[in-house]
Amino acid sequence: EVYSSDLSEFIFAAAIEIIKKEKIDLMYLSTTDFIQHKAAPGDKMANDFYHMVDGYLSKLYDLGCEISFTADHGMKGKTNKDGSLNLIYMQDEVDKKFGKDECNVVCTITDPYVVHHGSFGSFVTIYLKDKSKINEVMDYIKKIDGVEMVINKEESVKKLKQPEDRIGDIVVTSNEKFAIGKKESDHDLTKLKEPLRTHGGLGETDIPIFISRKIDDSYKSKGILKNYDIFDLALNYG
């Protein structure tokens, strides 16, 4: 069941059985982020999930595994204490100012699991029909409440390491209290039973990197670590 912790637990349980039956040099396990979307740190649901994860990691360690884990992103709440949501419907905003079909807002979180996040994230990219209006559109978006960063394609390639051939003319992120969607009519909020928690902005970039053995300090020469550095750290550092 994808809308529970069961799928993640199945992954760990399967790993235990595989390790018991055959010699494995390297195993990669990937869990879902449903619990993180639904529960903040310290909530019972979150605590129960991490208790389960900790139990399986302990079993893997006892079986002789060296364990390394990280996250693909952080997660922040986008809901006020009164239950109202902090949302920016970016396509509606730019259509209102510049006219329909002048800008095409592309949301990066559009998977079918809307119970997780309602297809809201903290990052969108925008393609413009008239490239001469890029600065004008950027200046307008910067004034929208909840927006944190507005940069052009060139800046996003340099600053965020975005692929130049697959990113729009403008990149927008919201601050850690807001989420961005496309058009209000495109999002079904009835599927969200708990406060909205999602990711994609600069406020969701802090993540843990854990390795079950001590490694030497030479890794510090890498500078600020990214989650993908975990492969290098786990395999190449003693």
Q: What is each stretch, according to the model?
A:
Residues 33-36, 74-76, 176-179, 215-216:
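Short, solvent-exposed loop/turn segments at secondary-structure junctions
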Residues 39-44, 80-82, 221-223:
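Short, solvent-exposed loop/turn segments at secondary-structure boundaries
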Residues 58, 75-125:
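Acidic/histidine-rich catalytic neighborhood
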Residues 48-90, 172:
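Metal-dependent active-site segment of extracytoplasmic phospho-/sulfohydrolases and closely related
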Residues 108-238:
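Active-site neighborhoods of enzymes that stabilize oxyanions during catalysis
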Residues 26-30, 68, 171, 210:
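Structural motif
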Residues 1-40, 122, 136, 142-146, ...:
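His/Asp/Glu-rich, glycine-adjacent segments
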